[in-house]
Each structure stands twice: as structure tokens, then as C-alpha cells.
């Protein structure tokens, strides 16, 4: 006697695929965050992340700004490959800034989820007004 025929597993829906993709992306950034966080306070001669954090928040912000500008330049120039690389640099330096400031990826995901489904104009209008100076 042969084995009974089994039905193939149902194909995941696009929504399930999207959720899986979102989770994988969050996990990549979480792993990078965990790696950067593990470098905090370690020997700056052995880790670029440790060296940045040892130099202080102003240097971290400067590096983030430099990478953001490079990213924008590549976007404006239409250099897709370079834009991808510079985008990765921006994300890395953003995560270094998060670690230094005590912000976790979960803090940011929570804020993004709170904003989900709200129009950008309505969300921005609902923010408290900040005074400069």
C-alpha cells in the first residue's frame, strides 16, 4: 500500500508574506542594534561603533548628518547602487545614535505603528508645537 496523498500546503497570502518580510526587516535592524549596543564601552581601537560612541554624541550626530547628505546626493543623482550603500550607512549611524541616546528599535516601531493609518498631514498637525530657543 502506498502513502495517502497529501495536499500541498496552502500558499501564504500577500498579507502573510508582507508580515513575514516586515518581521525579517525588523530582525535585521534589531541584530544590528544589538551588535552596536554590545560594542558600547568596549575598546575603541577594536570597534568602529565603540570609537564613535567614545567620541560623543556630537560626533555621532555629525557622522549621521554626513551619511544622510551622501545618501541624498546619490538619490538626486539617480545612482541606485550607491543610494543603497549610503542608505545602509545612514541606518547604521542612526542605530549608533539610538544606542547612545537610549532609544530602542521597539520605541521607534511603536511610534511608527501609532502613526500607521493616519495621514501625514493629520499626524503632523496633531503634534504638539515646539518652541525654538
From Swiss-Prot:
Flavoprotein recorded as keyword: no
Gene Ontology, cellular component aspect: cytoplasm
InterPro entries the record matches: HisE (IPR008179), PRib-ATP_PPHydrolase-like (IPR021130)
Keywords: Amino-acid biosynthesis, ATP-binding, Cytoplasm, Histidine biosynthesis, Hydrolase, Nucleotide-binding
Region described as Disordered: spans on this chain: 1-22
GO molecular function, one term: ATP binding
NCBIfam families named in the record: histidine_hisI, PRK00400.1-3, PRK00400.1-5
SUPFAM superfamilies: all-alpha NTP pyrophosphatases
Family per record: Belongs to the PRA-PH family.
Subcellular location field: Cytoplasm
Catalysed reactions, semicolon-separated: 1-(5-phospho-beta-D-ribosyl)-ATP + H2O = 1-(5-phospho-beta-D-ribosyl)-5'-AMP + diphosphate + H(+)
Biological process terms in GO annotation: L-histidine biosynthetic process
Organism: Gluconobacter oxydans (strain 621H) (Gluconobacter suboxydans)
Pathways involved: Amino-acid biosynthesis; L-histidine biosynthesis; L-histidine from 5-phospho-alpha-D-ribose 1-diphosphate: step 2/9
Protein name: Phosphoribosyl-ATP pyrophosphatase
EC number(s) stated in the UniProt entry for this protein: 3.6.1.31
Main location: cytoplasm
Presence of the UniProt keyword Nucleotide-binding in the record: yes
